[in-house]
UniProtKB/Swiss-Prot annotation:
UniProt family annotation: Belongs to the UPF0145 family.
Protein name according to UniProt: UPF0145 protein lp_2083
Superkingdom of origin: Bacteria
SUPFAM superfamilies hit by this protein: YbjQ-like
A matching Pfam family: YbjQ_1
PANTHER family, per database record: UPF0145 PROTEIN SCO3412, UPF0145 PROTEIN YBJQ
InterPro entries xrefs: UPF0145_dom_sf, UPF0145_YbjQ-like
Length: 115
């Protein structure tokens, strides 16, 4: 996993950049039988379904790590404007997408041309 900068903002103070392109990190998780039974019972009485919350948190982490890896493979230094999207594929599957814009920092050339 690559630890490059991922931010939800458009600008990174002190770091001008050029856009490389869009980048994604995706994962799909399925709920197991035990979670489904527990969720069904919790649905009857109300309240947070902690197993589902944990599954979504883990899915989010996987999606962001894949986003970082994909951005790094593109030669990016950072990802700006990162967002999440989630959705149900079926009653038993949940997808999480992390997406944003891969960017490369612009470094100033400090050499002088005396020609």
């Amino acid at each position: 996993m690559t630890q490059l900068l991922v931010t939800t903002t458009e600008n990174i103070p002190g770091h001008p950049y050029e856009v490389i392109g869009e980048v994604f990190g995706l994962t799909t998780q399925s709920k197991n039988l035990v979670r489904n039974i527990g969720a069904g019972l919790k649905g009857l009485v109300g309240g947070e379904i902690k197993d589902y919350t944990k599954m979504l948190e883990e899915s989010r982490d996987v999606a962001v790590n894949r986003l970082r890896d994909n951005a790094s493979a593109m030669g990016a230094d950072a990802v700006v404007m990162m967002r999440f999207d989630t959705g149900s594929i079926s009653q038993d599957m949940q997808s999480v997408a992390a997406y944003g814009t891969a960017v490369r920092f612009i470094t100033e050339d400090l050499t002088t041309d005396n020609a």
